[in-house]
Amino acid sequence: MLKMESTQQMVSSIINTSFEAAVVAATSTLELMGIQYDYNEVFTRVKSKFDYVMDDSGVKNNLLGKAITIDQALNGKFGSAIRNRNWMIDSKTVAKLDEDVNKLRMTLSSKGIDQKMRVLNACFSVKRIPGKSSSIIKCTRLMKDKLERGEVEVDDSYVDEKMEIDTIDWKSRYDQLEKRFESLKQRVNEKYNAWVQKAKKVNENMYSLQNVISQQQNQIADLQQYCNKLEVDLQGKFSSLVSSVEWYLRSMELPDDVKTDVEQQLNSIDLINPINAIDDIESLIRNLIQDYDRTFLMLKGLLKQCNYEYAYE
């Protein structure tokens, strides 16, 4: 025997279609409001919320359970249907349903949906006419029952009364919003002007700093040029000094080994780096003084051995 699950499939299809309708409604609303959105993000958020509400409220399981009961009855298994019938006519079930209805009413009242609004929503529905701004007000079965029971009255005085929504002074609200907007606009302009002044001051300081940096760079360039010229002059002076000393050395009646030693010391002077050149000249002068001191001591000792005395004049 073929097992029928058409009712379950229909319920699942209705639930899935409801979810797709919720996604389409959300995206179309965002488009009408001119809000940029990511379809995948909207789809994920709506699915998460939809699944949570359907599961937490028990609506999905309730619908699928009823569909399974109908399919079982269609397949010749009436046990579940009989149990559901007995459960529905049980006094405890009726009391529980009545309690749930009362909870829902209190929840709606706490949300600001009073009895008048609940009754009107239950008695009437609005049908839009495509292509027109007007609508058709339809009476529900509850309204029909109230008419049959004589629970509907016509109050002519109610027409002249103003509804609560009509008592709102939209002009004063508009004026208040306009004042708030002007105040906000003034604050924004003040902040913008202050920011502009700060930006101008920063630019002035930046230009002043750039001028100072430019002047310092020019001074540094001049000093660098002067240092380069001084270094070149010192190199020329040291080179001239070495040449002059070499020429003077060759003109003196000194032993060749002494001349060679002094010439080697002169040639070892670093003529490129003035600092090193000064150190080399200092070392050469010390060596000459040391050699002169040794020569003087030798001459002094020789005079003493010869029983001669010496004196400075």
Swiss-Prot record:
Keywords: Coiled coil, Host cytoplasm, Host-virus interaction, RNA-binding, Translation regulation. Residues 208-313 are annotated as: Interaction with host EIF4G1. It is found in: Host cytoplasm. Residues 150-206 are annotated as: Dimerization. Residues 166-237 form a coiled coil. GO terms for cellular component: host cell cytoplasm. InterPro entries: NSP3_N_rotavirus (IPR042519), NSP3_sf (IPR036082), Rotavirus_NSP3 (IPR002873). Residues 170-234 are annotated as: Interaction with host ZC3H7B. It comes from the Viruses. One of its GO terms (molecular function) is RNA binding. Residues 1-149 are annotated as: RNA-binding. GO terms for biological process: regulation of translation. Homodimer. Interacts (via the coiled-coil region) with host ZC3H7B (via LD motif). Interacts with host EIF4G1. Belongs to the rotavirus NSP3 family. Plays an important role in stimulating the translation of viral mRNAs. These mRNAs are capped but not polyadenylated, instead terminating in a conserved sequence 'GACC' at the 3' that is recognized by NSP3, which competes with host PABPC1 for EIF4G1 binding. The interaction between NSP3 and host EIF4G1 stabilizes the EIF4E-EIF4G1 interaction, thereby facilitating the initiation of capped mRNA translation. This is Non-structural protein 3.
